[in-house]
Amino acid sequence: MDVKTYPVLEAAKNRTLLDNETYLKWYQESVADPETFWGEHGKRIDWFEPYTKVKNTTFEGDVSIKWFEDGLTNVSYNCIDRHLKAHGDKTAIIWEGDNPYLDKKITYNELYDTVCRLANVLKKHGVKKGDRVTIYMPMIPEAAYAMLACTRIGAVHSVVFGGFSPEALAGRIVDCESTFVITCDEGVRGGKPVALKENTDTAVGIAAKQNVTVGKVLVVRRTGGKVGWAPERDLWYHQETAAVEPHCPPERMNAEDPLFILYTSGSTGKPKGVLHTTGGYLVYASMTHQYVFDYQDGDIYWCTADVGWVTGHSYIVYGPLANAATTLMFEGVPNFPDAGRFWEVVDKHKVNIFYTAPTAIRSLMGAGDDFVKRSSRSSLRLLGTVGEPINPEAWEWYYHVVGDERCPVVDTWWQTETGGILITPLPGATDLKPGSATRPFFGVQPQIVDGEGNVVEGAADGNLCIIDSWPGQMRTVYGDHERFIQTYFSTYKGKYFTGDGCRRDEDGYYWITGRVDDVLNVSGHRLGTAEVESALVSHQLVSEAAVVGYPHSIKGQGIYCYVSLMAGEVGNDELRQALVKHVRSEIGPIATPDKIQFAPGLPKTRSGKIMRRILRKIAEDDFGSLGDTSTLADPSVVDDLIANRQNRA
């Protein structure tokens, strides 16, 4: 196919940290001798005790991943204390509220004071090194304070996205046996309140029935809305932090001590607790933040993600703050009060680096260019995308209309499991191709394998694996190392299997083609089909459900549900709406089904396996190439599904 290439821009060449020659040299060193390469770059963070061992990893057998394993450090020290002398009065966090008239700036000195106070509150209430703290918060500075306060005392945080339901929150509290929750009275999104404290109360009740008792709930006052109160359990954040000292010594943490758990969807029902550890993660998050975004002192950097996702962990909080950057936290949504909001914020705060998701770009593109044109955006120097592959049309619009053809676009590919960006352009080094994540970051060795596991060289399509470790890699699934091995290392022995399909072109550029397992990517957020299916089946009228993705013009993938009802029940629009509501309450708004097709039967093999390939084709309105249906127990169900499909071109 004919692909336009955009050479490195002159402006990027002139002020970049890395040119192509340096990229090629460093990359070669990083894969030929990772010990020496990372031994050097590990020094970018401060260590209380320097490491002598750099890399100790194996993808075979009882998979074990250790980096800098005898070093001692602390994440909050690296994100705050070490900057105070030179950058104490510099703005660490710019907070932009949901309401365009609400904003505030927090300096590194203020960040130190607040994080130390919150760390002392945690200690006062018995939280110790290794304890798990659940953070269920909107995008307010206190969410970042909570994360950093946990790292200061060595507690392990588990941030749960504020859009998740009480049931989803409870499941995550129970899985890591968390006994302390930090939340807020209400969140605000697009002008509407989100009942976080109420959801927390419900979740804590559900957890108690599963023998996990949350001892304390710390509540930040965001709206002043009325909330239920359990006097023995609930604490007001403002009262507690005012009553303690603004100094708290950082805990000396081993590089391999757990840092955080973040739950992500898998192809089987229960979300996995992805465990990241301290040293390697921070080295990798800070290094990728610096070089991928060409971050230089004085830049104003804005990643539009939520701290409930890994992008918020690595590229709103830890990466930028470790680099003494000014990071912008945005509470709102791209289209409130209208579709010009992002660009107004860019002008208001003179943002230089802007990192968002293709789904937001597609939706703003659909709103028209006028919303973009009424802002100047002259401060912008670099644009980035994250969360899913970006289609070339959206890339071109982002580059030409938003960036005025003067900002490189870094299309970054990575995962919750990888801790940081793995495949990406570097602004001063990489010629760009719309839709391609281009080349691997330092130390990352991609490999494409076919369905049988044979390595394919040169220009090829297949499944994307990574053949050696990098410091930001997850270490295990919390409490279930066997699941970690089975999920990521059993499909192709000795290789980390990403679950993504991939194409490599004749220039060695990588193009991510999307998930090859039963995981959906909806608006850049991963969602297991099994999770949605089990939510549907938990409704009393549903006997069976199968969920697949289909192309969606804004979200990338939409959620298409085939639902078989209990004997004697008949599907109608009222039931359709009830099922949509049911899924939202079980998982959260993110899992809202786009299409529900009532199906008397599902295409199954004689052994009872649902043929999802066929369901995908029908959902895509493409049933000319269904392939061999002779293995189905009842081939006639296919005709019925086609006749009643919901997604007609």
Swiss-Prot record:
<feature type="binding site">
    <location>
        <begin position="411"/>
        <end position="416"/>
    </location>
    <ligand>
        <name>ATP</name>
    </ligand>
</feature>
<dbReference type="GO" id="GO:0005524">
    <property type="term" value="F:ATP binding"/>
</dbReference>
<dbReference type="GO" id="GO:0019427">
    <property type="term" value="P:acetyl-CoA biosynthetic process from acetate"/>
</dbReference>
<dbReference type="Pfam" id="PF00501">
    <property type="entry name" value="AMP-binding"/>
</dbReference>
<keyword id="KW-0460">Magnesium</keyword>
<feature type="binding site">
    <location>
        <position position="500"/>
    </location>
    <ligand>
        <name>ATP</name>
    </ligand>
</feature>
<dbReference type="GO" id="GO:0003987">
    <property type="term" value="F:acetate-CoA ligase activity"/>
</dbReference>
<dbReference type="InterPro" id="IPR032387">
    <property type="entry name" value="ACAS_N"/>
</dbReference>
<keyword id="KW-0436">Ligase</keyword>
<dbReference type="InterPro" id="IPR011904">
    <property type="entry name" value="Ac_CoA_lig"/>
</dbReference>
<feature type="binding site">
    <location>
        <position position="515"/>
    </location>
    <ligand>
        <name>ATP</name>
    </ligand>
</feature>
<dbReference type="GO" id="GO:0046872">
    <property type="term" value="F:metal ion binding"/>
</dbReference>
<feature type="binding site">
    <location>
        <position position="542"/>
    </location>
    <ligand>
        <name>Mg(2+)</name>
    </ligand>
</feature>
<dbReference type="InterPro" id="IPR025110">
    <property type="entry name" value="AMP-bd_C"/>
</dbReference>
<feature type="binding site">
    <location>
        <position position="526"/>
    </location>
    <ligand>
        <name>ATP</name>
    </ligand>
</feature>
<keyword id="KW-0547">Nucleotide-binding</keyword>
<dbReference type="GO" id="GO:0005829">
    <property type="term" value="C:cytosol"/>
</dbReference>
<keyword id="KW-0067">ATP-binding</keyword>
<dbReference type="InterPro" id="IPR020845">
    <property type="entry name" value="AMP-binding_CS"/>
</dbReference>
<feature type="binding site">
    <location>
        <position position="335"/>
    </location>
    <ligand>
        <name>CoA</name>
    </ligand>
</feature>
<feature type="binding site">
    <location>
        <position position="311"/>
    </location>
    <ligand>
        <name>CoA</name>
    </ligand>
</feature>
<dbReference type="InterPro" id="IPR000873">
    <property type="entry name" value="AMP-dep_synth/lig_dom"/>
</dbReference>
<dbReference type="InterPro" id="IPR045851">
    <property type="entry name" value="AMP-bd_C_sf"/>
</dbReference>
<feature type="binding site">
    <location>
        <position position="523"/>
    </location>
    <ligand>
        <name>CoA</name>
    </ligand>
</feature>
<dbReference type="Pfam" id="PF16177">
    <property type="entry name" value="ACAS_N"/>
</dbReference>
<comment type="similarity">
    <text>Belongs to the ATP-dependent AMP-binding enzyme family.</text>
</comment>
<feature type="binding site">
    <location>
        <position position="539"/>
    </location>
    <ligand>
        <name>Mg(2+)</name>
    </ligand>
</feature>
<comment type="function">
    <text>Catalyzes the conversion of acetate into acetyl-CoA (AcCoA), an essential intermediate at the junction of anabolic and catabolic pathways. AcsA undergoes a two-step reaction. In the first half reaction, AcsA combines acetate with ATP to form acetyl-adenylate (AcAMP) intermediate. In the second half reaction, it can then transfer the acetyl group from AcAMP to the sulfhydryl group of CoA, forming the product AcCoA.</text>
</comment>
<dbReference type="InterPro" id="IPR042099">
    <property type="entry name" value="ANL_N_sf"/>
</dbReference>
<dbReference type="Pfam" id="PF13193">
    <property type="entry name" value="AMP-binding_C"/>
</dbReference>
<keyword id="KW-0479">Metal-binding</keyword>
<keyword id="KW-0007">Acetylation</keyword>
<dbReference type="GO" id="GO:0016208">
    <property type="term" value="F:AMP binding"/>
</dbReference>
<feature type="modified residue" description="N6-acetyllysine">
    <location>
        <position position="609"/>
    </location>
</feature>
<feature type="binding site">
    <location>
        <position position="537"/>
    </location>
    <ligand>
        <name>Mg(2+)</name>
    </ligand>
</feature>
<protein>
    <recommendedName>
        <fullName>Acetyl-coenzyme A synthetase</fullName>
        <ecNumber>6.2.1.1</ecNumber>
    </recommendedName>
</protein>
<feature type="binding site">
    <location>
        <begin position="387"/>
        <end position="389"/>
    </location>
    <ligand>
        <name>ATP</name>
    </ligand>
</feature>
<feature type="binding site">
    <location>
        <position position="584"/>
    </location>
    <ligand>
        <name>CoA</name>
    </ligand>
</feature>
<feature type="binding site">
    <location>
        <begin position="189"/>
        <end position="192"/>
    </location>
    <ligand>
        <name>CoA</name>
    </ligand>
</feature>
